[in-house]
Curated annotation (Swiss-Prot):
GO BP, sorted A to Z: glycogen biosynthetic process
PANTHER family, alphabetized: GLUCOSE-1-PHOSPHATE ADENYLYLTRANSFERASE (PTHR43523:SF2), GLUCOSE-1-PHOSPHATE ADENYLYLTRANSFERASE-RELATED (PTHR43523)
Keywords linked to the UniProt accession: ATP-binding, Carbohydrate metabolism, Glycogen biosynthesis, Glycogen metabolism, Nucleotide-binding, Nucleotidyltransferase, Transferase
Entry keyword annotation includes Protein transport: no
Function: Involved in the biosynthesis of ADP-glucose, a building block required for the elongation reactions to produce glycogen. Catalyzes the reaction between ATP and alpha-D-glucose 1-phosphate (G1P) to produce pyrophosphate and ADP-Glc.
Superkingdom as given in the UniProt entry: Bacteria
Assembly and oligomerization: Homotetramer.
Name of the protein described by the UniProt record: Glucose-1-phosphate adenylyltransferase
InterPro entries, alphabetized: ADP-Glc_PPase, ADP_Glu_pyroP_CS, GlgC_bac, GlmU/GlgC-like_hexapep, NTP_transferase_dom, Nucleotide-diphossugar_trans, Trimer_LpxA-like_sf
Length: 413
């Protein structure tokens, strides 16, 4: 049986997710109520039976470190692990200078473990994937590198690294964020193949390419721009079409679902994908669960049923986590993390509320993201007057209001 190792790149700063990433790395941003973004790649590896994972961290990693240590305790008796790898400056007094450099500075991990194949996956996307199927494709093609790719509309090509393939799936071209005339999928002029930032290497090839790149002073030391763009011209590089990946318990509608949540708007929409009656991405797949930390909180509670007084505790088309109290208020099309309290006569609509937030009486909240440890005074209105909101909060062009972690909001604002 082949020896497998997963190197998870989780050091991303996530500037486009500011202010959610002011105090945490992008993979540590909460998602779907009770998860962190990093849980999706780790769950995919665990469900695929790949149980040796190194999580490479750097930027503001305390929150991420704490989460991984609490949530991802595999058994050392069977030599299974999820271990954090901080920047150690093993090759000199410098931080990681790119995704490829993050692997180069930790090559000792790979050479010590001696895997036959090494997965190098990002930690900032939302999806389900059976990585074993990618391995089977890699072996079948006798590839030295396999790049996972997802079909996207031609109109979105400028946001991704776009791959050109031949009829057998071998990479014959790669352009990072093309601004015009992107190469399309053979036989389908309406779609392109976008790199997912997930790679599978035959380990000998990985070591050779990483060392080669490290010795090039002109390199950006980035997997897409540097490793992939160079390697496909010299070695056997194939492209695995993620749309062909089949996960147990997955609906046909969910197949091929993959979201880059690197911007506020994309992050918001991916969360909203979860709350429909028939969601395009379901958290309720017991055959391929998303694992996370288990909280010791009581169940969610809904109190008051005074219809005549409009004081009814209810939530519709929403995800409400453990420890929440919906007290005579209405939550609709929203996601609440643990220990959120929504007090009487308040309404929360199409919003994402992080842990330990208190929403006062008669508040009206719409299309907002509220970070942790925020107390919203009674009668506060957010999301209904963007000009007013911009004086106090961050508001995106699409009208999403973000309230940073721990922000103090004055009564009568």
């Amino acid at each position: 049986m082949a020896k497998l190792l997963a190197m998870i790149l989780a050091g991303g700063e996530g500037r486009r997710l500011d202010p959610l990433t002011r105090d945490r790395a992008k993979p540590a941003v909460p998602f779907g109520g009770r998860y962190r973004i990093v849980d999706f790649v780790l769950s995919n590896m665990a469900n695929s039976g790949i149980l040796k994972m190194k999580v490479v961290v750097q930027y503001k990693s305390e929150s991420l470190n704490t989460h991984v240590q609490r949530a991802w305790r595999l058994t050392s008796l069977l030599n299974q692990y999820v271990e954090l790898v901080p920047a150690q400056m093993r090759v000199g007094p410098k931080w990681f200078e790119g995704s490829a450099d993050a692997i180069y500075q930790n090559l000792n991990i790979i050479t010590d473990e001696e895997p036959d194949f090494t997965f190098v996956f990002g930690a900032d996307h939302v999806y389900r994937m059976d990585a074993r199927q990618m391995l089977e494709f890699h072996l079948d093609r006798k590839a030295e590198l396999t790049v996972a790719a997802v079909p996207i509309p031609v109109q979105e090509a400028s946001e991704f690294g776009i791959i050109e393939v031949d009829a057998d799936g071998r990479m014959i071209g790669f352009v990072e964020k093309p601004q015009s005339a992107p190469k399309t999928i053979p036989g389908d002029p309406t779609r392109c193949l976008a790199s997912m930032g997930n790679y599978l290497f035959s380990t000998d090839a990985l070591v050779q390419e990483i060392v080669r790149d490290a010795g090039d002073p002109s390199s950006a030391h980035d997997f897409g721009k540097s490793i992939v763009a160079s390697m496909y011209q010299r070695k056997r590089v194939y492209v695995y079409d993620f749309a062909r990946n089949v996960v147990p318990g997955q609906t046909e509608r969910e197949r091929g679902y993959w979201r880059d949540v690197g911007s506020i708007d994309a992050y918001f929409q991916a969360n909203m994908d979860l709350v429909a009656v028939d969601p395009v991405f379901s958290l309720y797949n017991d055959e391929w669960p998303i694992f996370t930390v288990q909280y010791n909180y009581p169940p969610a509670k809904f109190v008051f049923n005074n219809e005549s007084d409009h004081r009814v505790g209810r939530a519709t088309d929403s995800l409400v986590s453990e420890g929440c109290i919906i007290s005579g208020s209405h939550v609709h099309h929203s996601i609440l993390s643990p220990k959120v309290r929504v007090n009487s006569y308040a309404t929360v609509d199409e919003s994402i509320v992080f842990e330990n937030v208190n929403i006062g009486r008669h508040c009206r909240i719409r299309r907002a993201i509220i970070d942790k440890h925020v107390d919203i005074p009674a009668h506060t209105t957010i999301g209904y007057d963007h000009e007013k909101d911009r004086k106090h909060f961050h508001v995106t062009e699409s009208g999403i209001v973000i309230i940073p972690k721990g922000m103090r909001i004055e009564a009568g604002r």
